[in-house]
């Protein structure tokens, strides 16, 4: 039985297309040590009395291969549904090298969100922590509060309103160069380029094509290594991501040094971007962020600010092509806004507040294909939840996949229906694409800005048809159509760029 399970694990690894060296390591490890670890795992499970039901899977990798495999097959809910049907809404597993309790209900979401720094703290697996180091995603307690206060000063609506025109101008330029006048485009790679360029400009004023190109090449390797099995061997995604992260930090370090000189000489403005803001401001104790902290947090925001938004925009284009009545309503709303502007006048913050239906469309896309699948916490003390013991030091995981497509919370959950966000909207803690509580994504307003400005500019210039109707969407690590969503562009009679 153990031999068969080892072979099954190897087959799952091959399905994930990891390098051959990784297969060899897995095979050697499981053939030589499978039975020994099987006994240890059984003993360990019995030692923790009262924990939620479930299984730890294999040592080191646990059930990570199946977890990732379901995502890459386009069925991330399968991992959770199969276990909730067997164990209930709270179950035990092992993900990315850690014993983990998974919470699969709105009540579980509320519990974790409301007990931050009381019973739990934000705690990604060590593999993620090693990539993002001293960033907001890895810090806890007072350090996290300090970082969040500093970053939110730049990312709050009052600050972002000053960048709406800048985003609008860049969006028009991007569409004119890469979309308008084309018969057919592949949306995902273009949207990745768009959101990455936008994030680089707003966060660090990186707009030189050579600098952008180098950073882009490293970044594409980096994003593939986030949320991977933490095996640091040559050829694995995780190992490649670590090297890419170091290269990105080196490039950011050079940019930081140049910016310091520019600020001292008066050639750069403290308000021009996030980098200048971080270099020019101090916390409550009068201390500035270190260069390493700045590098780590800009790396985090580049990741969160471009990969998540490009994913959402891509599936949004897919849904609008599949639902022409929704497209027409978005077009009507956006043309009303465009008609209220003077010729050449850029969008302003107040215009975004008028895009109510457009944002409901974006919310529905986020419900069906949320960019972030969930997040980890760690128990800072032993506690009881729903009659089960959660040991101190254990990881916990909440997931959008436990509520976003469940008929208990959303009628006809597989149907694209923006009207479900009218009025009071969904029940509390059922729609959580940005998380919740003190650890809610600090960039949610920036994401809203990116999405609405792009949507405004694309719909008023063209509509589009899917080249591959029914194209499958997989999650690796963000939702993405398997062919990148090729679309045929149909320009309007009047072009508004």
From Swiss-Prot:
- Pfam families given for it? p450
EC number(s) in its UniProt entry? 1.14.-.-
Look up the record and give one Gene Ontology term from the biological process aspect: sterol metabolic process
User: What's the cofactor?
Assistant: heme
Q: What Gene Ontology molecular-function terms does this entry list?
A: heme binding; iron ion binding; monooxygenase activity; oxidoreductase activity, acting on paired donors, with incorporation or reduction of molecular oxygen
Which cysteines form disulfides?
none
InterPro entries membership: Cyt_P450, Cyt_P450_CS, Cyt_P450_E_grp-I, Cyt_P450_sf
Ranges in a coiled coil: none
Query: Does the record carry Repeat as a key word?
Result: no
Q: What keywords are assigned to this protein?
A: Heme, Iron, Membrane, Metal-binding, Monooxygenase, Oxidoreductase, Transmembrane, Transmembrane helix
Task: Identify the residues that bind heme.
Answer: 441
What membrane topology is given?
Single-pass membrane protein
Give compartment(s).
Membrane
Primary location group: membrane
Q: What's a GO cellular component annotated to this UniProt protein?
A: membrane
The entry's family comment says:
Belongs to the cytochrome P450 family.
Q: Which PANTHER family match?
A: CYTOCHROME P450 26, P450, PUTATIVE (EUROFUNG)-RELATED
UniProt-recorded name of the protein: Cytochrome P450 716B2
Biological source species: Picea sitchensis
At the highest ranks, the source species' classification is: Eukaryota, Viridiplantae, Streptophyta, Embryophyta, Tracheophyta
Identify the gene encoding this protein: CYP716B2
């Amino acid at each position: 039985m153990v031999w068969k399970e080892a072979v099954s694990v190897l087959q799952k690894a091959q399905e994930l297309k990891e390098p051959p060296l990784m297969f060899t390591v897995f095979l050697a490890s499981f053939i030589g040590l499978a039975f020994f670890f099987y006994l240890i795992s059984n003993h360990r499970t019995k030692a923790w009395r009262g924990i939620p039901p479930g299984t730890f899977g294999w040592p080191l990798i646990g059930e990570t291969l199946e977890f990732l495999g379901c995502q890459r097959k386009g069925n991330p809910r399968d991992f959770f549904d199969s276990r909730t049907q067997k164990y209930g809404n709270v179950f035990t597993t092992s993900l990315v090298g850690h014993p983990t309790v998974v919470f699969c209900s709105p009540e579980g979401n509320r519990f974790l969100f409301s007990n931050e720094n009381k019973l739990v703290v934000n705690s990604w697996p060590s593999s993620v922590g090693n990539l993002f180091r001293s960033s907001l995603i890895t810090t806890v307690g007072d350090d996290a509060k300090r970082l969040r206060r500093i970053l939110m000063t730049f990312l709050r609506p009052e600050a972002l309103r000053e960048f709406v025109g800048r985003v609008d101008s860049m969006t028009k330029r991007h569409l004119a160069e890469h979309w308008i006048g084309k018969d057919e485009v592949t949306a995902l790679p273009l949207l990745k380029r768009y959101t990455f360029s936008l994030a680089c400009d707003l966060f660090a004023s990186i707009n030189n094509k050579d600098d952008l190109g180098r950073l882009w090449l490293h970044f594409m390797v980096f994003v593939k290594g986030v949320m991977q099995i933490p095996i640091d061997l040559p050829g694995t995604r995780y190992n490649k991501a670590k090297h890419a992260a170091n290269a990105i930090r080196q490039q950011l370090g050079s940019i930081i040094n140049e910016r310091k000189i520019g600020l001292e000489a008066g050639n750069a403005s403290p308000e021009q971007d996030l980098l200048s803001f971080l270099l020019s401001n101090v916390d409550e104790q009068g201390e500035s962020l270190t260069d390493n902290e700045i590098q780590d947090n800009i790396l985090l925001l580049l990741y969160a600010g471009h990969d998540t938004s490009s994913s959402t925009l891509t599936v949004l284009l897919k849904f609008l092509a599949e639902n022409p009545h929704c497209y027409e309503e978005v077009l009507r709303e956006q043309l009303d806004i465009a008609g209220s502007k003077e010729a050449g006048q850029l969008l302003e913050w107040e215009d975004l507040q008028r895009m109510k239906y457009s944002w409901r469309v974006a919310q529905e896309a986020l419900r069906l294909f949320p960019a972030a699948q969930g997040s980890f916490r760690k128990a800072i003390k032993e506690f009881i939840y729903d009659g089960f013991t959660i040991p101190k030091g254990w990881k916990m995981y909440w997931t959008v996949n436990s509520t976003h497509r469940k008929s208990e919370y959303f009628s006809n959950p597989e149907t694209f229906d923006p009207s479900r966000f009218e009025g009071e909207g969904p029940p509390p803690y059922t729609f959580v694409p940005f998380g919740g509580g003190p650890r809610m994504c600090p960039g949610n307003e920036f994401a809203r800005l990116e999405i609405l400005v792009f949507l405004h500019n694309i719909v008023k210039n063209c509509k589009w048809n899917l080249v591959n109707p029914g194209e499958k969407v997989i999650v690796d690590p963000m939702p993405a159509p398997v062919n990148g969503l090729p679309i045929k562009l149909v320009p309007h009679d009047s072009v508004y760029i």
